[in-house]
Amino acid sequence: MANGNKQAGQRISPSLTLLLATACGIIVANLYYAQPLVGLISKAIGLSPSGAGLIVTLTQIGYVAGLLFLVPLGDIIENKKLIVVSLLLSAAALTLTAFVKHGTLFLAAAFFVGLGSIAAQVLVPFASYLASDAARGRVVGNVMSGLLLGIMLSRPISSLVADIWGWNAIFALSAVVSVILAIVLSKVLPARKPTANTNYTALLGSMWKLLRTTPVLRRRAIYHAFVFGAFSLFWTTVPLLLSGPDFHFSQKAIALYALVGIAGAVTAPIGGRLADRGLTRLATGIALGVVVVSLLLPLMIQSSSPVGITVLVAAAILLDMGVSANLVLSQRAIFSLAPEIRSRLNGLFMAIFFLGGAIGSSIGGWAYASGGWSTALWIGIAFPVIALLYFITEK
């Protein structure tokens, strides 16, 4: 068999697992750095208030395009090369975002930042190839912990860096880090050349068939699309609540609040270990239930008192715990399928649930503007409840 498949099933070292987790966190953070800085960026590059949302939207569109059209390449071309080229593309786009002053050029660069960030989703199945069957859940869980930490840390880090050095600095710093990471990974990662005998057109054509004929993929994508929709809705609206007249949180205080979500990432490896022990179904039900509870708490107790703030902190931790665990359980289930199609399965899974997150964000902003915090929470609760009801039908 080819190089990469000989590697599969070997024991992955703790140091390589840590490197992959760190790399995933660094890469995926690029998708979120701009979110708390949209107001500052739009003024600097001359975008109207109505066009400011395109900064985040085009990054997301670029990422989804990469998930659908680039990540599947991991099934037919050498993985390390795909990872390094994607990182260098992202670094070039980040450099442009740091220095261009023209709105159209910035938005084009934002698209390519998203496109290049798919390197993280090539690394995750890559880690699963290197792990033995018995340890696959644990390894994927550890790598996903790094990815989730990147998501959770990105917003407070970009806010704090912008507060000190200006909004450009975070993109310039990330460009430098991306180049360094590309060099390190090119030296350290083992080669993996897939054995799939197909061309790119046939590869893309097979994805719709995979979605139709793989029930585990469909179920797991639907579960996590609703869960991630609730996650995105919460983290889109809670900064609006905290900066409003009831709480009067500063940008730094909101950044510190966002840091509490880090505690939730610790459940990712726990979820992986439970899956390795054959407890995927039980753990999935618990994870979905935790997400429902996390949104019920702030709905039942709404106050700007210390008790109310404590409830919001607990809600953030529980939400991130449930989402993190469900993500790892889902990827463990998907990566247990045929290894030669893992990149396509992962690309489809990520694209579907990321679309759910984008819908959650947009609905959250509308719900908060239309009916306030309670309306947003009720809609947010509906998402994991639907996922839980669908989960009950699983045989």
UniProtKB/Swiss-Prot annotation:
CDD domains: MFS_NepI_like. The chain crosses the membrane at residues 18-38, 53-73, 82-102, 106-126, 142-162, 164-184, 222-242, 252-272, 282-302, 309-329, 347-367, 372-392. Signal peptide: none annotated. It is found in: Cell membrane. Its main location: membrane. It is a multi-pass membrane protein. PANTHER family: MAJOR FACILITATOR SUPERFAMILY (MFS) PROFILE DOMAIN-CONTAINING PROTEIN (PTHR42910:SF1), TRANSPORTER SCO4007-RELATED (PTHR42910). This is Uncharacterized MFS-type transporter YdeR. The gene is ydeR.
